Amino acid sequence: MLPPLTTKANDQLNRPEVWAWAEREVARQGAPTLAPQFIQAWDYARNNFFMADHLDLERQIRFVNMLVCGDRTVTAGAYPVRYRQTPAVFANGNEGANWQEIPRLMSQLCKSPLFWDREIEEFCIEFLRIHPFVDGNGRTASILLNRRTWKQDFISVPTVVGWIEDARV
């Protein structure tokens, strides 16, 4: 069951630039029919990711990923850990983290200060290098990135020069 949109969400989510960003992201990442789920996940992230919840960040990220992938059977409080259990090879030939290391790497990343200390781009780069999920990693990273930056503008990928070419674990 998807969480209901927040009361504040109606005004924020009906803005044309929000839907344009969502449609651009899901199309860019090969899931053009999942814009509503992407919006739902972004609404959840922007209204539930707070510093007071920093010890729960990993669980929240898993929930956002399940939402962007259209999993309607989840609730925010109870669901299984669904990290990938296969190798991941990127289009540029680089590989994601060894799947057996994903729980440890995600735990370390989420306990680091990167997400909360204005180092969100570095957090997202590390998240994408780990590539913890079977599907929806890019959409999840976009939501995480824009959780911190959306009031200025929506961005698709971290702006650190060369990070895609250098993406290695």
Language-model features: where?
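FIC/Doc superfamily catalytic core
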Residues: M1-V169
